[in-house]
Amino acid sequence: MIYRENFGSLILPLLLSALVGYLLGSISFAILLTKAFAHEDVRAHGSGNAGATNVLRVAGKKASALTFLLDFCKCVASVLVGYFLVKHACVANGVDPEMARLGMYAAGFCCMIGHMYPLYFGFRGGKGVVTTAAMMLLLDWRVFLICFAVFLLVFLKKRMVSLSSITAAAIYPVVTFCMTYFVDCCVGGLPVLYVVMATLVAALIGATVIIKHRANIKRIRNGTESTISFKKK
């Protein structure tokens, strides 16, 4: 159980977790690798997005695969740093160690924001799909697997990463609620507060990803959105 007088001890590590997450998220591997492989700014080509999909269009499969891997890893690093920073504070101040998950949420979400609005690259980044996927996996692998399955089904049908990402983001809070309430709460005995917190964060993450895809949504409606081809360049 966490007491009011102890909660203040988590504020600083939570803020530090958020800062670390944002700074790590601001490292845009899409921009760095496209410059290294193709000597171009990925944001000046294709969709204008600094993400693995656009890197595939501009710099090829190797650069895209590396971008995907490194974007995933930076979110993993952020979430782990956030978890251990807050867990250390919990142990030192007699707070329930389960509250360390707050550090994961803070660092992971801010890593996603850093990826979208990178400090080092004029606040023009990607749409946060890979970083969001990494955070989903670390926070709840069950929810991740369901959302990823939906992502794959939509992608195999439409060949549009944007539509697949939007669909997965839209169902993310719904799947999170169902899993945390019907499994973790009703069966596992976790408090309703945990369900509320997890669902609210999932809704915030999903909404952020969808908002970042506004231009893609317009192109999908107009039938002009780009599709992915696996033919050799």
What are these regions (language model features)?
Residues M1-L12:
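Short, strongly hydrophobic alpha-helical membrane anchors
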Residues I31-S64, G125, K218-K233:
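Cytosolic, membrane-interface loops and tails of multi-pass inner-membrane proteins
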Residues L145, V161-A169, L190-A202:
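Loop-to-transmembrane alpha-helix initiation sites
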Residues I2-R4, C90-G94, Y181-L193:
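Membrane-interface helix termini and inter-helical loops of multi-pass transporters
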Residues E40-A52, Y120-A133, M160-I171:
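Short, non-helical or kinked segments that cap or interrupt transmembrane helices
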Residues P13, S17, G21-S26, A30, ...:
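Alpha-helical transmembrane segments in multi-pass membrane proteins
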Residues L56-G60, G82-V86, G128-K158, I171-T180:
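Interfacial segments of multi-pass membrane proteins
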